[in-house]
Amino acid sequence: MLYYLHYYSGYLGILNVFKYITFRAMGAAITSLVLCWLLGRPMISLLRKLKAGQPIRGKEVVKDLAALHGSKSGTPTMGGLLILLAVSLSCLIWVIPTNKFFWLSLLSMLFMGGIGFWDDFKKVIQKKHYGISGKIKLLAQAIVGVVVGIVLLADPETSRLAQKLTIPFLKEVKHIDIGWMAIPFFILVVMGSSNAVNLTDGLDGLAAGCTIGVAFVYAVFSYISGRADMSGYLFLPYIKGAGELTIFCSALIGACMGFLWYNCYPAAVFMGDTGSLAIGSALGVVAIILGQELLLVIAGGIFVIEATSVILQVASFKLTGKRLFAMAPLHHHFELKGWSETAVTVRFWILSLLFGLLALSSLKIR
């Protein structure tokens, strides 16, 4: 909304800064960060009054995990509401309100946040341990993929890119035409991203910290893709209006930083499915809009590893009756092997940073 102030720069020159994406991106990050700081304690107090405490998985299933995390029982969850609120308000202040890519990303995030809230509500308020069914979550993620696909394919400006799969690090074979397979592929991306972040959200600060690096990578790619000069030089497709996603990603970065203030060990609040499903969906949708879906595998390497560990664990147990890991997702494996929770979290943050740098290096290594 503040973007329109630059039209009055003739009266007050400094207002011209509101035209620049970089300035508005910094403003969005700071705004969402401050909003999380200010709203964090009231939100946590409200969740405590509602008795929205997180039940600890493992008391009946994995006794060792229950022993490690038993003290967390009753910690308020659904803290993802804080992230959703901060991102939404920040973006409404700093993003051009007519930008279709912003609305597509934000509405997808809010929709999956609503599904996550429903799941958390059933778990912590209605005391139904398993929440909503996995089929409902998958259906919701499929709906996001289909809607995003229809919007992009119906628009002549984005239709061609939406049907092409961009290969990172390759200059000669940088696109593969997937045609009508685009929508099924988008569904897979949203499902994979949303569930991977959800699986990663098992330790204090882990998912939020890893999200910061991934969102930064896509903030950079959004900025470059939205500029004809820079995108041409770096062999990225030019997408008119994509620069506003830089602001969306920056708001997400700020919100995750602010949330970490309360979510770092020992956590005063958990994001729950309200936050993890929403964040994963948002990252997936941004990747789809930019045509950088495969880059998400690199930038979100920790999310991929966590999800893969669960898949391998289930497959191994069903095929051989043996488990590959002490427990899945992988962060619990290291906990049960003797690593402290903070050690696992910080080491995974470091790896996430390295994955982010590797993803950014694809801009020049071609």
UniProtKB/Swiss-Prot annotation:
Membrane topology category: Multi-pass membrane protein
Cofactor dependence: Mg(2+)
Spans traversing the lipid bilayer: 27-47, 76-96, 101-121, 136-156, 176-196, 205-225, 241-261, 264-284, 285-305, 343-363
Domain of life, source organism: Bacteria
UniProt pathway: Cell wall biogenesis; peptidoglycan biosynthesis
InterPro entries reported for this sequence: Glycosyl_transferase_4, PNAcMuramoyl-5peptid_Trfase, PNAcMuramoyl-5peptid_Trfase_CS
One of the record's GO cellular component terms: plasma membrane
Cysteines paired by S-S bonds: none
Catalytic activity: UDP-N-acetyl-alpha-D-muramoyl-L-alanyl-gamma-D-glutamyl-meso-2,6-diaminopimeloyl-D-alanyl-D-alanine + di-trans,octa-cis-undecaprenyl phosphate = di-trans,octa-cis-undecaprenyl diphospho-N-acetyl-alpha-D-muramoyl-L-alanyl-D-glutamyl-meso-2,6-diaminopimeloyl-D-alanyl-D-alanine + UMP
One of the protein's GO biological processes: peptidoglycan biosynthetic process
MF terms (GO), sorted A to Z: metal ion binding; phospho-N-acetylmuramoyl-pentapeptide-transferase activity; UDP-N-acetylmuramoyl-L-alanyl-D-glutamyl-meso-2,6-diaminopimelyl-D-alanyl-D-alanine:undecaprenyl-phosphate transferase activity
EC number: 2.7.8.13
Enzyme type, top EC level: transferase
Family: Belongs to the glycosyltransferase 4 family. MraY subfamily.
Biological role: Catalyzes the initial step of the lipid cycle reactions in the biosynthesis of the cell wall peptidoglycan: transfers peptidoglycan precursor phospho-MurNAc-pentapeptide from UDP-MurNAc-pentapeptide onto the lipid carrier undecaprenyl phosphate, yielding undecaprenyl-pyrophosphoryl-MurNAc-pentapeptide, known as lipid I.
Protein name: Phospho-N-acetylmuramoyl-pentapeptide-transferase
Native organism: Methylacidiphilum infernorum (isolate V4)
Lineage: Bacteria, Pseudomonadati, Verrucomicrobiota, Methylacidiphilae, Methylacidiphilales
Gene: mraY
